[in-house]
């Protein structure tokens, strides 16, 4: 029985558990503070709240009665709600029927209202029918009166127009004709009426007669053949121009064409192709002539033509078109006589004249012209050629002093740019050839100056400075580019770029690479073999202080040239036409300067490396098995440190402006010296325990010196670059591990082999063989050791074999020879 009650209670509890969302909705709709309504109601806690102490149990009967009373009230409420829901369905159906009846009544009322509205509308139409007829009659009457007035005005105007035309009263005709034309527009829809059509035809006839009459008057006043009529313009012609404004635009264009043609007829005679003044050396006279003609026109005919005709500008523009055609014709005929100075003189005078036109005229008559307005290049923050606009209005001459002229404010766009000077573009090859010749002479002068003046003097403040010749070269490049961009931004700019590329390569070869100190006495030029390869036991001459400074100076110059060449490429792309941008590419030239930088660094590395070779050779020839005690660092270490302290501060001070390349020098020296040091370590055999300890001490000393290499001998101590530190630590730690393996006892063999694999992580049997030779083991012992070593080697990962050996061991002579051949081919390809 008790079990059934427990199951029932558990079922009730489970049934009362509601979802959190449902519980939250109930609490929102029926908020309650009663603990019994809480979702997390706990009966034990509730009872403990009612009876907190044993004494409170005395009131248990009272509490039970209250709860029973509350239960009875809840039961009554539940019964009331249940009874209330008994008739809900019937009440709902009744309410729905009542709603449907109400809707039907509403539809009936709406229909009645609609019928009444239609009847009201019909009644209003009947009432206003007569009023609408009156409105239409009034509107038609007004239109008829207006039309009759217009007809009267048109008829009278046509009669007056014909009479005034016969009497050439152009002043009155100008105003009357415009009015007649405006009135005639009102009769466009009545052209089917014969009388209206007749009036329209009379107006057209009057217009045609006026046009022919005005053209005849201008032909009489300004005949196409013969000289201009003396005296100023008549008032009749001035009024005729006002009439022409109202007539067909072709009349106006014909008047303008005849007048300009007659006005420039003298120019065509004076500057015929066979005349002496027609050649480029007297091009000033052409522009002086048109200036006089424009002044003469303003004085005599300025008031004759309406201001909106812009006759002065039209005369100037037509002069430009004629001049461009005539100059192009004569230059084709006498192309062999064109010299660069003459061409630049003519272009400079022409561009000055075009600038004068831009100041005087707006260019409004060029809307349908043949000259395309040039697009302004986008603004640039590039420091290269930042003051290039300063030479735009100056005379174009090929002198270095032009680069020092003060910067002028940027001039606005010139709508007349190229209107005449376009004819010179096909002949700009003369200018390009001249620049080719000038640059060739400039490079030869740089070579001669370097030979005469010699390398820069060794000075801490000046050593490693950029050679002055490279600044002169780029200043000249700047002036050439500005000149050419003023002349043309098309194919001539591409041709000039090709010239720039040619002499950048020549500068890199003749001035930079050609003056690098040679490492051999052979008469051949600098080769990569002489930079990288040395014969065993040969004596390599050490560079002097002057030669070290020269190498650093060439390196700094190459870096400057590389950066400036990149800026030059960007500026050329800004100047050239958008369709030609892809043809500007100076990557090959920047690569050339990069090779010069690499060669310079390699020379510095080789010099210091070669200086350390005798010390390393001495180390390998010492009798290390006879060393009896460990002392201070060995003499060969002192010698290496001495060479480093002599060379590195000089190189660092001379490369102060190019810190990244000094870092490259340090990295390349470490990559060269450390493998060579390890190779010489392997030559030290046999080695006693004490000898190995001395070598370990020496190796640690060299490691400390190499770590301090970037700031050695400097008053300002800087932290070495992390990339350099990693190389030194990795390489010299390998040397220390080799010596520690040599110091370890070879008995038992298994422990020795495992210790070797653990310390060196080198799976190469050649390296292990060298370690055994350093320990002085006999061949029989070495054979067993090698066999054990092969057995104890860990299995390499798939696809990888001897990775540790490849990454840690020094390159073999065959590998080095292959690298040298590849590098030689690369340099030949670039240079």
From Swiss-Prot:
Annotated stretches, region: Disordered: 370-391, 794-819
Q: Where are the annotated coiled coils located?
A: 54-141
This protein's record includes keyword Coiled coil: yes
Primary localization class, coarse: Golgi
Query: One cellular component GO annotation, for this chain's record?
Result: EARP complex
Alphabetized UniProt keyword annotations: Coiled coil, Endosome, Golgi apparatus, Membrane, Protein transport, Transport
Enumerate the Gene Ontology biological process terms.
Answer: endocytic recycling; protein transport; retrograde transport, endosome to Golgi
Location in the cell: Golgi apparatus, trans-Golgi network membrane; Endosome membrane; Recycling endosome
Q: Which domain of life is it from?
A: Eukaryota
Q: How does it sit in the membrane?
A: Peripheral membrane protein
InterPro entries from the UniProt entry: Vps53, Vps53_C, Vps53_C_sf, Vps53_N
List the PANTHER family hit by this protein, alphabetically: VACUOLAR PROTEIN SORTING-ASSOCIATED PROTEIN 53 HOMOLOG (PTHR12820:SF0), VACUOLAR SORTING PROTEIN 53 (PTHR12820)
- Protein task: Acts as a component of the GARP complex that is involved in retrograde transport from early and late endosomes to the trans-Golgi network (TGN). Acts as a component of the EARP complex that is involved in endocytic recycling.
Family of this protein: Belongs to the VPS53 family.
Q: How does it assemble?
A: Component of the Golgi-associated retrograde protein (GARP) complex. Component of the endosome-associated retrograde protein (EARP) complex.
According to UniProt, the name of this protein is Vacuolar protein sorting-associated protein 53 homolog
């Amino acid at each position: 029985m008790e079990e059934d009650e427990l199951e029932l209670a558990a079922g009730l509890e489970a049934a009362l558990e509601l979802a959190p969302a449902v519980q939250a909705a109930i609490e929102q709709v029926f908020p309650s503070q009663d603990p019994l309504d809480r979702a997390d109601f706990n009966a034990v806690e509730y009872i403990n709240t009612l009876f907190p102490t044993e004494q409170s149990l005395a009131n248990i009967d009272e509490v039970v009665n209250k709860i029973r009373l509350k239960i009875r009230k809840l039961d009554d409420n539940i019964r009331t709600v249940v009874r209330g829901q008994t008739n809900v369905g019937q009440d709902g159906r009744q309410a729905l029927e009542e709603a449907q009846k109400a809707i039907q009544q509403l539809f009936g009322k709406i229909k009645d209202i609609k019928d009444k509205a239609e009847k009201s509308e019909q009644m209003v139409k009947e009432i206003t029918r007569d009023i609408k007829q009156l409105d239409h009659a009034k509107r038609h009457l007004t239109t008829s009166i207006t039309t009759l007035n217009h007809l009267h005005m048109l008829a009278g105007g046509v009669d007056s127009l014909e009479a005034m035309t016969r009497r050439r009263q152009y002043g009155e005709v100008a105003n009357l004709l415009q009015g007649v034309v405006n009135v005639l527009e009102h009769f466009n829809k009545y052209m089917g009426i014969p009388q209206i059509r007749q009036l329209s035809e009379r107006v057209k006839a009057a217009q045609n007669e006026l046009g022919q009459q005005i053209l005849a008057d201008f032909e009489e006043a300004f005949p196409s053949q013969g000289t201009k009529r003396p005296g100023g313009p008549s008032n009749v012609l001035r009024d005729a121009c006002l009439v022409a404004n109202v007539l067909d635009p072709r009349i106006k264009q014909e008047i303008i064409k005849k007048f300009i043609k007659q006005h420039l007829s003298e120019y065509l005679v004076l500057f015929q192709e066979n005349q002496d003044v027609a050649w480029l050396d007297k091009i000033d006279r052409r522009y002086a002539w048109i200036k006089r003609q424009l002044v003469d026109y303003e004085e005599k005919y300025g008031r004759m033509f309406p201001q909106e005709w812009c006759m002065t500008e039209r005369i100037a523009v037509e002069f430009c078109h004629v001049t461009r055609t005539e100059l192009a014709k004569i230059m084709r005929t006498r192309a062999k006589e064109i010299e660069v100075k003459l061409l630049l003189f003519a272009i400079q005078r022409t561009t000055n004249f075009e600038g004068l036109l831009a100041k005087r005229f707006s260019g409004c008559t060029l809307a349908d012209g043949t000259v395309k307005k040039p697009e302004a290049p986008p603004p640039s923050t590039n420091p290269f050629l930042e003051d290039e606009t300063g030479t735009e209005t100056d005379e174009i001459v090929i002198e270095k002093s032009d680069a020092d002229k003060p910067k002028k404010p940027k001039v606005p766009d010139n709508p007349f740019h190229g209107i005449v000077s376009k004819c010179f573009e096909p002949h700009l090859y003369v200018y390009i050839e001249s620049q080719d010749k000038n640059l060739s002479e400039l490079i030869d002068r740089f070579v001669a100056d370097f030979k005469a003046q010699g390398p820069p003097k060794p000075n801490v403040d000046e050593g490693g400075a950029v050679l002055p010749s490279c600044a002169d070269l780029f200043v000249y490049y700047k002036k050439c580019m500005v000149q050419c961009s003023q002349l043309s931004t098309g194919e001539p700019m591409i041709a000039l770029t090709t010239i720039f590329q040619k002499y950048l390569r020549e500068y890199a070869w003749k001035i930079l690479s050609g003056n690098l100190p040679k490492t051999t006495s052979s008469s051949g030029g600098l080769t990569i073999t002489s930079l990288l390869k040395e014969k065993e036991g040969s004596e390599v001459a050490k560079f002097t202080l002057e030669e070290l400074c020269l190498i650093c100076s060439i390196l700094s110059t190459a870096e400057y040239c590389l950066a400036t060449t990149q800026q030059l490429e960007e500026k050329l792309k800004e100047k050239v036409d958008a369709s030609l941008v892809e043809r500007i590419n100076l990557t090959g030239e920047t690569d050339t300067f990069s090779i010069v930088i690499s060669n310079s660094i390699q020379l510095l590395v080789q010099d210091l490396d070669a200086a350390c070779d005798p010390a390393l050779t001495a180390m390998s020839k010492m009798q290390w098995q006879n060393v009896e005690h460990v002392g201070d660092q060995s003499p060969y270490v002192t010698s290496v440190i001495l060479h480093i302290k002599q060379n590195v501060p000089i190189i660092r001070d001379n490369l102060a402006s190019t810190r990244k390349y000094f870092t490259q020098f340090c990295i390349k020296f470490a990559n060269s010296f450390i493998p060579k040091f390890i190779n010489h370590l392997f030559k030290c055999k046999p080695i006693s325990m004490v000898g190995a300890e001395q070598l370990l001490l020496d190796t640690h000393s060299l490691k400390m010196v190499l770590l301090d290499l970037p700031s050695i001998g400097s008053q300002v101590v800087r932290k070495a670059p992390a990339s350099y530190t990693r190389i030194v630590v990795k390489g010299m730690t390998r040397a220390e591990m080799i010596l520690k393996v040599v110091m370890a006892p070879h008995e038992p063999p298994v422990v020795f082999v495992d210790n070797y694999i653990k310390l060196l992580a080198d799976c190469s049997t050649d390296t292990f063989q060298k370690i055994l030779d350093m320990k002085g083991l006999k061949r029989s012992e070495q054979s067993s050791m090698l066999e054990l070593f092969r057995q104890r080697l860990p299995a390499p990962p798939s696809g990888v074999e001897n990775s540790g050996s490849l990454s840690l061991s020094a390159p073999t002579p065959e590998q080095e020879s292959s690298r040298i051949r590849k590098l030689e081919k690369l340099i030949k390809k670039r240079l």
